[in-house]
A protein has these predicted regions:
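C-terminal catalytic/acceptor-binding lobe
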Residues: 1-19, 29-32, 50, 202-275
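Hydrophobic targeting segments
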Residues: 32-38, 55, 63-68
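Active-site beta-to-alpha loop of glycosyltransferases that engages the nucleotide-sugar donor
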Residues: 38-49
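Short, acidic, metal-binding catalytic loop of nucleotide-sugar glycosyltransferases
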Residues: 51-63, 71, 83
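Residues at the starts of beta-strands that form the adenosine-phosphate
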Residues: 63-64, 114, 225
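Active-site-proximal specificity loops/subdomain of glycosyltransferases
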Residues: 68-113
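Short beta-strand-to-loop acidic/aromatic patch adjacent to the donor-nucleotide binding site
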Residues: 112-123
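Conserved catalytic core of nucleotide-sugar-dependent glycosyltransferases
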Residues: 125-200
């Protein structure tokens, strides 16, 4: 977390904490037909309520927000998080611990619904869902994301380190190398991902630490384009203390994303190199 992010984070956390639980947990009249799905880990269990609060304060509001927790955490749910459950927000439990559960269980439960995935270590702005849905209406078949990188190769056709994958900031780019990055919110239309997305054994073998790459691969198998959102929002505000345990330390700093992408591309015979 950057030093300049601390003060905005503390201010936003304080503002969300002081909102009336009864007001933010009730259903808003202004809604969009979206299911928001996320997960968290034990080290963030006391912090994730701020992410949930920010989503409950969304305008428009989603039909449902589901937090997937490992079943071993059922007795450890903080009272402040539990109190947010109601018509919109609910906690469900999974036998798994990997990050992919943020989406796979919701795909099983709601195969005919548009699903938005978010991360658990940030606080989102109120217009996030409205802007994502507006972007979806413009490009209804595409996966829409507020942060996108392009899977990049060198002149020899070798995958570049993840830190060198280009950032995409234009919604007009239509290229199968576009990969949504989950932290800023990703919208998945109905049927956008291949049915193999639920193959737990396979993604644990090929991409155990990167749900982004697994979901990108499943989009490619279905011929689904990923697109930078034409209607964007400000980046979410990081939560102070949320980065003690983070996949970024492994995937980015140790370049595991590149290795996992090579595994996926080889297994599924995917070639995104320019001809």
């Amino acid at each position: 977390m950057k030093l300049k992010e601390y003060f905005p984070s503390i201010l936003r956390s304080f503002a969300l904490k002081n909102k009336s639980v009864s007001k933010i947990k009730s259903r808003n009249k202004n809604t969009v037909p979206l299911i928001v799905s996320l997960t968290t880990i034990p080290s963030r269990l006391k912090l994730v309520q701020y992410t949930v609060r920010s989503l409950l304060c969304a305008n428009p509001q989603p039909d449902k927000i589901i937090l997937w927790l490992n079943e071993d955490l059922e007795s450890a749910v903080p009272a402040g998080l539990k109190a947010l459950e109601g018509d919109v927000f609910e906690i469900r439990y999974s036998p798994y611990t990997f990050s992919h559960r943020k989406l796979i269980h919701s795909l099983e439960l709601f195969p005919d619904r548009i699903i938005v995935t978010v991360d658990d270590d940030v606080m989102y702005h109120p217009n996030l869902l409205g802007q994502l849905y507006k972007s979806h209406l413009q490009y209804p078949k595409d996966i829409i994301a507020n942060r996108v990188r392009s899977i990049s190769y060198n002149e020899q056709g070798e995958v570049l380190p993840y830190k060198q994958w280009k950032h995409v900031t234009s919604s007009s780019i239509e290229d199968m190398t576009m990969m949504p990055v989950g932290v800023c919110g990703v919208l998945y239309p109905v049927g956008s991902l291949n049915k193999q997305v639920l193959n737990v054994d396979l993604f644990q073998e090929l991409s155990p630490k990167s749900d982004d790459l697994w979901f990108k691969t499943m989009a490619l198998l279905n011929g689904t384009l990923s697109r930078f959102a034409p209607y964007t929002v400000e980046d979410p505000i990081p939560l102070v203390g949320s980065q003690k345990v983070a996949l970024k330390k492994t995937n980015v700093n140790e370049d595991r994303n590149r290795v996992q992408w090579e595994n996926l591309a080889l297994h599924f015979n995917i070639d995104l190199k320019e001809k």
